[in-house]
């Protein structure tokens, strides 16, 4: 009859007895269309009134629930195990979501919780003993890095995070906060690469906070990258001079160290930082560690620059990502930007002194908007412009734009027709920036072999890494050569180039070199040095002891 349902209605299941006895509406477990059923009374008669236009939820029979659930689980697991594509897609999804390869829960390694707690202790010690201050603003970056490391250790899903780099150099700190010097640009590029490869990077300021970090997680530390003077302090620290050394490092107090006062690993202090894990940042070509060039990190490939083919470990840097943000202009200012940070560069070691003005005046004017515009040379050397727009006067009629922020300088470079070197600064990143934005570089040749003047292997130039790069990208001019400089300026002013990034400045290559630094067995390499170079002399065994001592 209308408004009621019989027990034979296949679309109706009774509520459980406890529901009827409760005498109130209960939401059943199953979704069954757009009606639901309520008892008309609590008299025990199973007579239901259909209420329409309201969603109907129906509770299936209790005995069928466990069976249905079990069946569903079996079917799901059977399908997942038997279909590789399903497994692959699930793994891909997890990898995509997490950014790292997930490990199953049953693969949790014993001791991960203990290791995570040790990292927590380290974080607490650093925050208490070496907090982030105005003088050490990058230390607060460590807290997030350590939290990330703790999380992956606890869940046993670390990839490269468990491989730690300690950076004890003002250039890492300067690069992190936007420093524009050559060393800072290099360090920032290294830091970006280390992070992109998912290694853990920790900032330190001196040899004692570096030692504290190392001693808490020695097996995780793959490399300690030092500033030369800090490495020297670590080596020198002993029971008689430690107080004097600490006096020079106000932000790296070492009073926490009890017992023997030391920093570097030795037979008397085996818990110290190993030589073979210690690498030194060095902008120039000479090795600065007892283990030689492979433990001296350099921004340029000196094995290809030096006449004898000797070199340090080339890490290099890449400005590829950042310079690609800037436009390559078809129309440029009819001017050349002189590469010089300080006014003194125009008087000290200026290889074009006295001829810059003459060479400038020899460049033909450009026609812009129907008018002839003379070629000019400009510079950003010196102080910022005063309120009235004045700044230092520069020789030979060179226009001073005044010191400017990095972004503004880069735009000025991008709109120039050439970048002109006069001798200093050496190995600056600016020529690379210019080439990447389509601006050629005039590279001054400061020295050459008189009997073989065209042999570039024996040239000494302002930017030696570019001395093999040909025109129209790089114009090489001998110092004091007015004709050569005039001709180079004219060709550069009238020959447009597109973006040019040397192969060794590519990001992909730099990442591979950072991987090599992090993945090489440097203990084995150091043992070879001790055996071959030092002939296993006992006094050099501390460079790579027979017992590694880093676990």
Feature locations, PLM:
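Catalytic core of nucleotide-activated saccharide and alditol-phosphate transferases
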Residues: 219-350
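N-terminal signal-anchor transmembrane helix specifying type II single-pass membrane topology
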Residues: 15, 19, 23-101
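Short acidic, S/G/P-rich loop/turn micro-motifs used as interaction or catalytic elements
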Residues: 171-182, 209-210, 229-236, 240-241, ...
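Short alpha-helical donor nucleotide-sugar binding micro-motif in glycosyltransferases
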Residues: 412-416
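Catalytic binding pocket for nucleotide-activated donors in carbohydrate/polymer assembly enzymes
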Residues: 417-516, 531
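Well-ordered, non-membrane alpha-helical segments in soluble/globular domains
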Residues: 180-190, 348-366, 483-490, 511-520
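N-terminal pre-catalytic "stem/leader" segment of glycosyltransferase-like enzymes
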Residues: 37, 60-64, 78-235, 516-551
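Conserved catalytic-core segment of nucleotide-activated headgroup transferases in glycan assembly
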Residues: 177-183, 307-410
